[in-house]
């Protein structure tokens, strides 16, 4: 629900920029605040509706709102030459590789998207999965669906820099930098 609310705000901002550019005075910082608010709402909706039978119907890869810029770029009001879009969150996109803790909101958002779909899959198919025999597993559509989800999860993890991965990097390192909670979220997903 929060995602739909912020999506309406972004739509109004986009319409205003498109139809009345001389009257739209949002700075880059204000625009980025809207973007970050949108993705925080998306993550919150994922967290609150985890495992719900009918999770909200937004497909992550089809969302046209750009992903947040790094914390450093945001803090220093630097506009990167190009922005990551949700559809770019794969191993084929150079911008998506080696994401550090400064891209934590992007990492968490994508992680929650995958987590919700895995949890929904497990909830909806737990009886069928429990009754699968080893002979069924080679051709089962359920197993194929699980493999696709697992591949997405593995790809998501591979896009992260080693400094974001526990236990390769200690929690204390990120706590010292003020990123302890974010580091924990990423590694709990």
Which sequence ranges carry the predicted segments?
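Acidic, Ser/Thr-rich, low-complexity intrinsically disordered regions in fungal proteins
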Residues: 1-102, 122-137, 154-178
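Aromatic-acidic/polar surface patches that form glycan- and anion
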Residues: 30, 100, 104-107, 142, ...
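Generic preference for well-ordered alpha-helical elements
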Residues: 31-35, 108, 146
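Long, repeat-rich segments with strong aromatic
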Residues: 102-123
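Charged, amphipathic alpha-helical oligomerization/scaffolding segments
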Residues: 110, 117, 148, 152-155, ...
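A conserved active-site cap/scaffold subdomain adjacent to cofactor or substrate pockets
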Residues: 136, 143-146
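C-terminal substrate/ligand-recognition segments
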Residues: 182-189
